[in-house]
């Protein structure tokens, strides 16, 4: 058992038999009353995000989650296949386990897979990835005084807004947390 002072971003808590990862936390010491910890938790299995408050010093159950360096190989009909770089085992994850990370997975993409009791839980992507633009309309600056954007389809099939000067084949850097264009690669 651990206490609420051990809660940090990314820590996995076992609450009522469900694994939840801490997205945000805040230690609050009000002028009146006792201190408490306000958290935002994401259920690993369902993806549901909930707010939960713990009294300061309360006991919580921290779960050991192993992080494996992996490479994305391919997608078949019902799963995504990754290769563990330590022992070259193949790991299969369902679409719900991969979730929105599927928008940024290209062949041989390096990722981290979180596992609990040797069962894969979810995919952790790097903060940004480099992807190629496969389709976009030609951009026309025309009479704009400020830069504009246009839709572009990436090699993964994901569509984002990019500046007008981006053309088909351009490799761009995309923020995996927001899905926004960062810059040319």
From Swiss-Prot:
PROSITE patterns: EFP (PS01275). Belongs to the elongation factor P family. Transmembrane segments: none annotated. Signal peptide: none annotated. Keywords: Cytoplasm, Elongation factor, Protein biosynthesis. It is found in: Cytoplasm. Pathway: Protein biosynthesis; polypeptide chain elongation. GO terms for biological process: peptide biosynthetic process. GO terms for cellular component: cytoplasm. The keyword Protein biosynthesis applies. It comes from the Bacteria. This is Elongation factor P. SMART domains: EFP, Elong-fact-P_C. The gene is efp. The keyword Protein biosynthesis applies. One of its GO terms (molecular function) is translation elongation factor activity. Involved in peptide bond synthesis. Stimulates efficient translation and peptide-bond synthesis on native or reconstituted 70S ribosomes in vitro. Probably functions indirectly by altering the affinity of the ribosome for aminoacyl-tRNA, thus increasing their reactivity as acceptors for peptidyl transferase. Pfam families: EFP (PF01132), EFP_N (PF08207), Elong-fact-P_C (PF09285).
